Design a protein with these regions (language model features):
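Conserved SAM/SAH-binding loop
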Residues: 111
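Class I SAM-dependent transferase core
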Residues: 7, 11-103, 121
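Conserved SAM-binding motif I beta-strand of class I
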Residues: 124-129
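Aromatic pocket-lining residues of Rossmann-like dinucleotide-binding sites
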Residues: 118
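Class I SAM-dependent methyltransferase core
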Residues: 106
Length: 131
């Protein structure tokens, strides 16, 4: 999965209804900092990946809340803190430069949000979901 870098070009941070996500994304990042996320690479990745596109459009206004949201099929997208913490923990075992992971296999990827975040740090991400 080659997601890194394409999101900001393809999905400008404004919805079709004109709602802007910039302020709420900034608030999400500040909240993650306040909750103890320290790796700025992780915070940068979360600020670049547009979480709202992984949700039904009816939930876009809640996309950057620090909570799990339903994605259908009795599943949820993980709250941003959990995504940040898992990614930060994974990166704590790697170097600090460039693409630090070669291959990542994510089992139970749901809508792909965590996979998109991981694509900022891995050469290849393979995501598997049972749906």
């Amino acid at each position: 999965m080659r997601c890194a870098g394409i999101f900001t070009e393809r999905f400008l941070i404004v919805s079709s209804s004109g709602f802007t996500f910039t302020r709420v994304k900034d608030q999400m990042i500040q909240q993650l900092l306040d909750m103890g996320i320290k790796d700025f690479r992780v915070l940068d990745a979360l600020s670049q990946v547009p979480r709202h596109i992984f949700l039904d459009q009816a939930l876009w206004s809640r996309a950057y809340e620090n909570r799990a949201l339903t994605i259908g099929y009795k599943q949820t997208i993980s709250q941003p803190y959990i995504v940040a913490r898992m990614t930060e923990h994974l990166l704590s075992h790697t170097s600090k430069r460039g693409k630090v992971l070669n291959h990542v296999l994510e089992i139970g990827s749901g809508c792909g949000y965590q996979s998109a975040v991981l694509s900022y740090f891995a050469n290849d991400v393979c995501a598997v979901e049972r749906i």
